[in-house]
């Protein structure tokens, strides 16, 4: 098993806390991190295509920010911008790099939706075959 840590990052408070924890653990074990921004494709056509372009642009900016945070912390990081459902994407990336852990915030930008239809962390802990660290967001 590698010393890589996969972290789900979306630029929200939950994402920032997850990234901080991934960086802390990576420093402790002498590992690196893979920062993943996963997004569900928006249906194409007309204004929806424009929205999809905005989502992609935002994702690139968010990953650039995260890569800079890792560099300041002195941790080697690579970024993955992947279309797909976040829990499934995080598992696929973790499997591909034989990650030691997956780190994710307890919620992103829609905590109520997660409570109703099932959150990404909930799905992730049931799909992953490796430890998942769910970082609680302080009140």
Set out the residue ranges of the language-model regions.
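Structural beta-alpha unit
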Residues: 68-102, 122, 139
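Short secondary-structure boundary segments
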Residues: 37-39, 105-107, 136-137
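General small-molecule cofactor/ligand-binding pocket signal
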Residues: 36, 78-82, 133
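Small/aliphatic-rich secondary-structure junction motif
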Residues: 2-49, 53
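Short, solvent-exposed amphipathic alpha-helices that sit
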Residues: 21, 54-66, 89
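Glycine-rich, Arg-bearing micro-motifs that act as flexible, cationic patches
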Residues: 101-126
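Short glycine/serine/threonine/alanine-rich loop segments
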Residues: 31-32, 75, 99, 130
């Amino acid at each position: 098993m590698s010393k890589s840590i996969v972290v789900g990052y979306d630029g929200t408070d939950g994402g920032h806390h997850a990234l901080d924890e991934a960086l802390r653990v990576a420093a402790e074990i002498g590992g690196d991190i893979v920062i993943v921004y996963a997004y569900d494709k928006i249906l194409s056509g007309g204004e929806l295509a424009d929205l999809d372009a905005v989502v992609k642009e935002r994702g690139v900016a968010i990953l650039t920010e995260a890569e800079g945070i890792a560099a300041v912390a002195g941790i080697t990081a690579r970024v993955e911008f992947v279309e797909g459902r976040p829990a499934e994407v995080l598992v696929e990336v973790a499997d591909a790099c034989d990650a030691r852990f997956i780190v994710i915030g307890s919620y992103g930008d829609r905590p109520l939706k997660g409570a109703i239809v099932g959150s990404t962390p909930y799905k992730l802990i049931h799909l992953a075959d490796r430890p998942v660290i769910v970082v609680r967001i302080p009140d």
